[in-house]
Regions:
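Boundary/linker segments flanking structured domains
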Residues: 1-2, 9-78
């Protein structure tokens, strides 16, 4: 089962977005949190490489806590 890793400042909204984009969405988890986007971006690819996940790079910088999330899925929609 493939897995995906990403970063966001709004985990609830991001989770809902991914639920609509993939089939078999499961095992949503917050892997870590950081004070800056740069710290989260540094952690994200290391985790992805270590566990064989696809990294999904976040969008524009935003204030607040940055969360690194992960989940499993069966396939993308479409």
């Amino acid at each position: 089962m493939p897995c995906r890793v990403g970063i966001t400042t709004d985990p609830d909204t991001r989770r809902d977005q991914w639920k609509s984009q993939v089939v078999g969405f499961t095992n949503w988890r917050i892997l870590s949190s950081f004070r800056s986007r740069a710290e989260a971006q540094e952690y994200e690819p290391r985790y992805a490489r270590r566990y064989g996940c696809h990294a999904y790079h976040g969008g524009a910088d935003a204030p607040g806590t940055w969360y690194v999330y992960g989940f499993d899925y069966t396939r993308t929609r479409g």
